[in-house]
Amino acid sequence: RSTAKDEILTGSYIDPTKTRFPLADYSQSVDKWIPPDSADYTIPVIDSATQQRYFSALKSHYFGMDSEAHSPWNDFYITALLKKNAAQARDASIKQFLSDGSTYWGENFRLYTSRWKEEVRGNTDTQIDNIYHASRRGIMVRESLVRALPTDDPLFNDPRQAGEGYPFDNLQMSSLRPGTPVYTLTKSKDQRWQYVVSPAVTGWVHSEDIASTDQKFITQWVLL
């Protein structure tokens, strides 16, 4: 049941103007709130032409091969990206998180040591070729976390500060779903990580989460 304001002890509630909102009192079935027999139930939110336009834009962004598309499988896009210093974002993360003066905490609430920084930095010390190679195109075969550095170790700001520490991992950028196209810019020295371009983010993912593709596969995949 909801809690009346006069039942709340003075000083025991962060905001006395608010009361409890018991989720159990509200149906979690969408049909309760949008009845299937309502007059406008089958009316689309956007018309079919608009739906198709946005769907085509999405497909182009992921798999488009023309000079305007930003697909990781698109040689026009990747070639242009490589000419713009593709290593800049990678090197910025290395400088921010692994420089001698950087101060970050691990999951044990202790500061990361210089040795840890050196190990991770050494694993990133690989060259990014500024020439496009079709053989570096790939596809994600499982859900994969995208990391700012090639490590699964979390990296936190001062956990003593409000809004910092767990679970706010500075190295966790995003994730990629199975079927997402990628282009590998480089691999870590231990070969366990690949620094990839995806349609939405560039970062480090586990090598085991990627499968190589060739032109035959790409042609078939795009036609699906």
Regions found by a protein language model. Name each.
Residues 3-167, 174-177, 183, 192, ...:
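Boundary regions of SH3-family modules and the immediately adjacent low-complexity/disordered segments
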